[in-house]
Each structure stands twice: as structure tokens, then as C-alpha cells.
Amino acid sequence: MSDPHVVARLRAAGCVWAEDEAALLVAAAVSPDELESLVVRRVAGEPLETVLGWVEFLGRRLLVAPGVFVPRRRTELLARRALEHTRAVPAGHGRPVVVEMCCGVAPVAASLEGAHAEVHASDVSATALGCARSNAPSAALHLGDLYDALPTGLVGRVDVLAANAPYVPSDRVADMPPEARDHEPLVALDGGADGVDLHRRLAADAARWLAPGGVLLIETSPGQAGLTTGAMEAAGLATWVGTDDEVGGCVAVGVRPDGVSR
């Protein structure tokens, strides 16, 4: 049950789904003082998810905290594809090795809990990795920049490498909703001049880390998918693009053929 006074304050602040948000805030608060604190934070523009402390993703609640990138529903496509490719690894191959790069709070790694895979996740944010530890307790976490964060023992062993690297062009960041622009780290949003700087870096070294037949999955946008797959093809990967209109997801896929040198 939502509080009409909370609804009115949220609506005045521009919250489109004021009644739904009010009900969530009321349910989360254990006292009137805490409810007031939560409402003040939301009215000030903080994302609802970090106010509540969780985001729903593929049917589970993931821990989020102020200052982290909040997983979007469109990233469910990336997580589903990662799980599908993990399950497709031949049984005689041994445990599949999966890496979530630029993991943030590790939505992909969290989706692989129980998949009987060796899962690694890396990010440049210690705060995000703190959340990732709760969301993906079975994963090995690594702090650092892209491949520099990974143990060298993974070279040539990765069956699935998934990344939701930032892909907003630098000159479009200012146009993003204030919940993202003002409350999420710029490093998790800004993808460089054309939005795919990190995609190029991920693709350039992927063949060295992927096992023969391993796949690189990068979330992108329909308008940038050609740039992302182009970077993969330049690195010797065979590519295609998958989309899901229901969640608004777009994933570029690159496969390492057996003959690509590491």
C-alpha cells in the first residue's frame, strides 16, 4: 500500500511511476524516520534502485549501492546468452571458464550461480566489486583495468567472455537522464568519441584469452553494433549480432576459431 503523501512528493519531483515507487519505499522502511530519509533521497534524484539497495534482474534481487552502475533490464540478454554458451560447452571439456569483464555489481556472474562453471568477474571499482561479492559469491573477483585484472592462468582458457562495457558516446553523456548522469560513475557510462573505445580494447586481446571456439559477448546498441563487430572481426573473430526487442537488448558475438593464434 502506497502512502498518498509520499506519492504526491514523488510525483511533484517528476517520478513517472510515483505510486509504484511509493509502495516500494514504504515496504522498505522500518520506521517513519527511515521512510522520510528514503523519500528525500529519491526526490533529490538518486536512482530508486540505490535508494532501495537492490535491483531486480532475471528474477533475483541484486545488491546495489550509491556510486555504482545499476544493471538495466536490457543486460538480461547478455546474461542469458552467457548462460546459453556456458551450457553449450561440451561435457568432456571440463568446467566451463567464464569471465564477466567491466562487471559492476556482476549481474552476469550472478546469473551463472549454480551453473557449475569457473566464473571470474573484474571491474575498476572496488565499491562495485563489494556488491558483486554478495551477488555472485562463487565467483573469483579481480580489481583492475580489463585484461590487466585477470590472472595469467586464464590465457587461452576462457570459454565465455561477457562484457557490458560503457558505450555512450562522450558527447551524449550530458543528454542521459539525471539518475544516471549525476549518480552513476562516468567511467561506467562514457564509451569515448563513438562509444566503442572499450569494445575495441576488449576485442583486440580477446583471441589470446579465449579458448578455441570461445565466445566474446559485448552489449552494444543497434546503431553501434557494426562498430563493435568490426572490432571483433579485425581481431580475427567470426561475428554476429543478437537482439531482444522485449528487453531492448543488443549483443555482439565474436567466436574464436581454432586457428586464431593466441
State the predicted function of each range:
Residues 1-16:
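Non-catalytic nucleic-acid substrate-recognition regions in nucleic-acid-modifying enzymes
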Residues 19-85:
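Conserved AdoMet
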Residues 25, 45, 75, 108, ...:
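Residue-level signal for inorganic ion chemistry
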Residues 60, 94-97, 214:
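Nucleotide donor/acceptor-binding cores
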Residues 74-175, 223:
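Conserved SAM/SAH cofactor-binding pocket of Class I
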Residues 139, 167-197:
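Mobile active-site "lid"/loop adjacent to the S-adenosyl-L-methionine
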Residues 193-254:
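Conserved Class I SAM-dependent methyltransferase catalytic core
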Residues 257-262:
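Flexible, glycine-/basic-rich loop-and-beta segments that form/coincide
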